[in-house]
Amino acid sequence: MFRNYTDSVQEMVLRAIDSIRDSVINASSAVSTTTLPPLDIPMTSMKPPSIIPTVELVLGTITYLVIIAMTVVGNTLVVVAVFSYRPLKKVQNYFLVSLAASDLAVAIFVMPLHVVTFLAGGKWLLGVTVCQFFTTADILLCTSSILNLCAIALDRYWAIHNPINYAQKRTTKFVCIVIVIVWILSMLISVPPIIGWNNWQENMMEDSCGLSTEKAFVVFSAAGSFFLPLLVMVVVYVKIFISARQRIRTNRGRSALMRIQNAEGDDDYRKMSIKRASVESARTSSRVGEKTPLVIADGQTTVTTLAAHSTDGGSLPKDETTKHMKYHNNGSCKVKVKDVKEDEGNPNPTAVLRKREKISVAKEKRAAKTIAVIIFVFSFCWLPFFVAYVIRPFCETCKLHAKVEQAFTWLGYINSSLNPFLYGILNLEFRRAFKKILCPKAVLEQRRRRMSAQP
C-alpha cells in the first residue's frame, strides 16, 4: 500500500512537471517568433523518467527537505539577529548578513529544483529556459557564498594584523563596498555562459540540465569560485593562527619579566614602606584636631600608624591591625608591626598575571580550533564537487555515477546550511540572540530571576 502511494505521488509530480515544461516551451517559442531566434536544442529525444525505488525516494526527499529547512531557518536567524539584537549591530557583521543572504537564496532558488529533478528520476523536465536560469543562479549564488567566506577571512586578518588603522577604515561604507565587489565578482563568473561561453547545445541534447563543460570556462569558473578563494582562506587563517601564537609567546615573556621584577622589588618595597610610615607619622600641621589614618601594607608585613596632626590627607587601604594603634596627645604615636596574611581583596600581581595568561591561552586555542573547523568544513563540502567538475571535461572516460555526482552536489549545498552554525552559533552573542528570538519568555524569566536574586 505504501509503495502504491509513493508511486502515485511520483506520477503526480511528473505530470505537474510535464505541464510546467509545456507552458515554458510554449512561452519561449512565442517569444522566439517575435524577438529571438529559435533555440536549436531538440527536446523530443527525452526518455521517460525512471521510477526511483520507494525507500530511496522517501529517504532522499526527507534528507533534501531537512537540508533546505536547516539552511532557511539558520540563515534567517542570522539576518534577524544582526538587525534586531543590539550587541550584534556591528559593521563587521554585515559580512555575515551577505553570507546568509547568498546561502538563503541557494536554499530558495537552487535546492528545490534539484529536489524536483530527483523526484523525476534524475531527468530534467523543465525546459531549456528554466535550465539556463537554474545553472546561472547555481553558479552565482554558490560563488557569492564562497567569496563571502573569503571576505570574512580577510576582515578578520586585517582586524588582527593592523587593528588600529583597520578600525578606522572599517566603516559601513567600506564594508558595503567590499560586499558589492563580492557580488560583482560572482556575477562576472556566472554570466559568461549566458553570453555564449558554453556548450549547452551538446549538454541539452537529452533530458538533462548540467553546467557547461567548455574547458576554458570550467578552468576559469573553478579557479574563481573555489580554488583561489580556498588558497586565500588557508593563507589568511594560517597567518591569523601564527599571529595568535606569537601573541601568546609575547604575553608569556612579559609575565615572566614582571614576575622577576616583582620578586626583586619585594624587599626594597617593604623597607620603603616602613621608612615612609616613620616619616609620615612625624609630620604635624597647624590644623589641630584633624586626624588622618595612614596605613601601609606590603602583603607580608603591615605597618600601621596614626598622625594626629598630619598634613597629608591620603591613606592606603585600611587593614584589620588599625584597631591595635595607640596614640598620645603630644602628636606622637606608637607603631605596631604585625605579620598578617595576604589580603584576599588584593591578590598577588603574579597570580593575576598567571590567571590572565591562562584565559588568553584558552581564547587563542578556541580561536585556532574554530579556524581549523572552518577550513576543514569548507574544504570537505566543496572540494569533491570542484575536483569532479574540473576533471570531467578533460577526461571523457572519467564519468562519475549519477548518484555520486548528486551526492557531491548536495555536499556542497550542505556548506550553506552549516555556515550559520560555524559563524553564528559558535559566537556567544549570536547564541544569546538566537535564544532571545526563539525563546523570549525563557529569557524574560531568566532576567527576572537574576534581578530578584540581587540584594
Curated annotation (Swiss-Prot):
One of its GO terms (molecular function) is G protein-coupled amine receptor activity. The chain crosses the membrane at residues 61-83, 94-115, 134-154, 175-197, 222-243, 371-392, 408-428. It is found in: Cell membrane. The keyword Cell membrane applies. It is a multi-pass membrane protein. Residues 1-60, 116-133, 198-221, 393-407 are extracellular. The different isoforms are expressed in specific, but overlapping sets of sensory, inter- and motor neurons, including AIY, AIZ and RIA interneurons. They are also expressed in pharyngeal cells, head muscles and excretory gland cells. Disulfide bonds join 131-209. InterPro entries: GPCR_Rhodpsn, GPCR_Rhodpsn_7TM, Octopmn_rcpt. GO terms for cellular component: membrane; plasma membrane. Glycans are attached at residues 4, 26. Residues 84-93, 155-174, 244-370, 429-455 are cytoplasmic. This is Tyramine receptor Ser-2. It comes from Caenorhabditis elegans. The lineage of its organism: Eukaryota, Metazoa, Ecdysozoa, Nematoda, Chromadorea.
